[in-house]
């Protein structure tokens, strides 16, 4: 199911200052909000740090030192992002001095080893053109970089997208100078306005042949209500439907796919009296998988933390946010 969801970010955006993050995560199983540009610029945010801990029912909080970090420029554009993940365990040497009692050594110096977490950190850097559109997204994972290059048409739609595996030829690893570059994939997109409420996007492979088609539906207020995806040479289909409440807020998202049999995933939203997302429930089929609860500062109304209840694992993911400002 996950491979269908990434393209949804192309055209979905809800730029309300009251709404601090978009209700369209690129990954249905992601535990992070996608902060909106109006939220960043309105509050003059420079950096956001997220500290992540995990707690199983009837157990103490487990802090593995996991974190995420977003860095923005003064125009609200995301410049850098990184996240840490646990790679495994390593042994750390611990030196123990000799033990003396009444001037007499009763235990000699010793060495012991204790397990500690080993981390992987993925860094992503973003580059923009004069129209403030992303043209390069470069992610470093170890010695290699996965880089996506974007080109746009006159209407601001992504027209070409190329993904490369790259190396850094610079001796200073904090500076990037292109070394070896290998093409991994290349796509082109063509757009057709069918009517005032419908638009079609064709996905072309590196041979210029259409392999996928996306049809977007909008209401009379310009809000997207449905997205249908279909592959040209296979039976696979997927759709996303958005339902809005009387205040124009997303009330429900429904995702369906036949990629692995008939699958459905649904998100339901409740809001505070201040028009902020309060609770989000995510279902797979009829089973509740995750329940999000969002906590805000009473005075600034900024997001301070959110809790993700994993119903099947009987556990909670706790994410706390801290900010730096311009």
Say what each PLM segment does.
Residues 1-23:
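Bacterial Sec-dependent N-terminal signal peptides
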Residues 19-326:
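Buried hydrophobic residues that stabilize the cores of well-folded domains
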């Amino acid at each position: 199911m996950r491979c269908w969801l990434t393209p949804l970010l192309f055209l979905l955006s809800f730029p309300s200052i009251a709404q601090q993050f978009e209700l369209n995560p690129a990954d249905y199983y992601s535990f992070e909000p996608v902060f909106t540009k109006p939220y960043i610029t309105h509050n003059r945010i420079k950096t956001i740090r997220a500290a992540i801990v995990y707690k199983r029912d009837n157990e103490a909080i487990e802090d593995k030192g996991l974190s995420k970090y977003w860095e923005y420029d003064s125009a609200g554009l995301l410049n850098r992002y990184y996240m840490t993940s646990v790679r495994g365990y390593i042994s750390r040497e611990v030196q123990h001095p000799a033990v003396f009692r009444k001037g007499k050594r009763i235990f000699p110096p010793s060495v012991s080893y204790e397990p500690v977490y080993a981390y992987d950190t993925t860094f992503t850097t973003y580059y923009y053109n004069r129209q403030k559109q992303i043209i390069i997204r470069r992610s470093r994972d170890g010695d290699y970089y996965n880089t996506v290059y974007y080109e746009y048409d006159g209407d601001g739609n992504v027209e070409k997208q190329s993904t490369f595996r790259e190396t850094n030829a610079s001796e200073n690893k904090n500076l990037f100078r292109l070394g070896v570059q290998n093409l991994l994939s290349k796509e082109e997109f063509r757009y057709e306005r069918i009517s005032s409420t419908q638009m079609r996007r064709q996905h072309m492979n590196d041979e210029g042949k259409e392999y996928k088609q996306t049809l977007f539906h909008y209401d009379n207020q310009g809000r997207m209500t449905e997205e249908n995806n279909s592959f040209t040479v296979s039976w696979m289909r997927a759709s996303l439907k958005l339902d809005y409440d009387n205040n124009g807020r997303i009330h429900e998202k429904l995702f369906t796919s036949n990629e692995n049999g008939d699958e459905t995933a649904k998100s339901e939203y409740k809001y505070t009296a201040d028009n902020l997302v309060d609770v989000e429930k995510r279902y797979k089929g009829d089973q509740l998988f995750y329940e999000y609860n969002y906590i805000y500062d009473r005075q600034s109304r900024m997001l301070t933390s959110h809790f993700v209840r994993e119903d099947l694992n009987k556990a909670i993911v706790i994410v706390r946010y801290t900010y730096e400002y311009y």
